[in-house]
Every structure is written in structure tokens, then in C-alpha cells.
Amino acid sequence: MTRILTLGDSLKRFYAIIGHRAPSSGKLNLNDLPGSGRMDVLVRAINSALFLSHGIRNDSLITLHLQGGEGPDRRILFDGTTLAGVRPDERSIAGQIKAIMKLPIPPVGRFQEITQGIFHSGGDITDTIESWTKDNVEINILDADGTNIAEKNIVEKIGIILSDDLPFNEYEKIFSIHMTKYHWEENGYRDILA
């Protein structure tokens, strides 16, 4: 089944997670997620953005950017409004990513639904930012040197860009120069996600 993903007004929290070394295609070793481009860090971020203690956060859209390995970049979207069949553990999320990595990468901007609430497309972070800008999402950067995010006023549509264990590369720094930078403190993370 293939359909084009359109962003609805009910989505409020947008996350872009950049995996600099995470392969966009090929094999993913579920027994060695840290050795697979730090996939462990990426799936933990997805898990935190998607799941509550009692269910799925239905107001979140997470875009995982796989930028490592051979071939073009891939974006995988997890849509909390329709997501089903994914458990809140690293191995389950990584298993979904592994299955997608075996598929050909669709053209940039055309998201193909793989399973309920999970889509993939070609493209990189600039494509995601362009989409968010069109949807009037306020874009912010998660940065250790930024302001505490708990001090931020929450807007209707907030977008947060975060990196894996690597800092933003020079290209990513250029596009993010005018974006507000925040960091999480102990309770800041829960406050923004609650």
C-alpha cells in the first residue's frame, strides 16, 4: 500500500533526529545497535518522543534521518496519530528500521507507507526543514550550549532538531544559524513532552 503523507493540523510536536553514521540501506545488526551507526541512540530518541507510560503520543511526528553508509540519505517518519504494531523498546523500533533499510529508497518528498504510521522517503534534513516551514512549525535546535528548554513557551507546532552522538557538521551548522538553541535539564525533557 502506498499513499502520500500529508501533515494534519492535529500534529503538534515535530522531531528531526539526525543519524550521521546510521546506514540508509543494507543490514542492521539488532545485536549491536551501538556498532550500527549508533542506532541505539537514535531509537532511544524515537522511543522517548513517541511513547508515554500508558500508550503512544498521538501528537508527535518523528523524522529519522539516516545519513551514513553507501547511497542516498533516507528519512523514516513515525506518525504518532496512526502508529500501530510498534512496542516501546529499542529492539522493536530497530527491527522496524531494519526492515525499511532493505527497501529501495523512494524519491525525495514522496513518502511511502510501510506499515501503519511508518513511512519512508529519500531526502535529508533540509527537505524536512522545508516541509516544516511550509507547515508553520517553529523550528528549534537541541544543543548542549543552548537555553534550558523548560523556559520556552510552548507553541502550537514546535519542531526540535537533534543529532546523534556527533555534533552538527558544518553544513548543518550553516542552515541552523538562525534557529533558537535549547538544551534539556533534568525535568525540561518531561515538561516539553508532557
Residue ranges and their predicted role:
Residues 1-194:
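Post-transcriptional modification and biogenesis factors for structured RNAs
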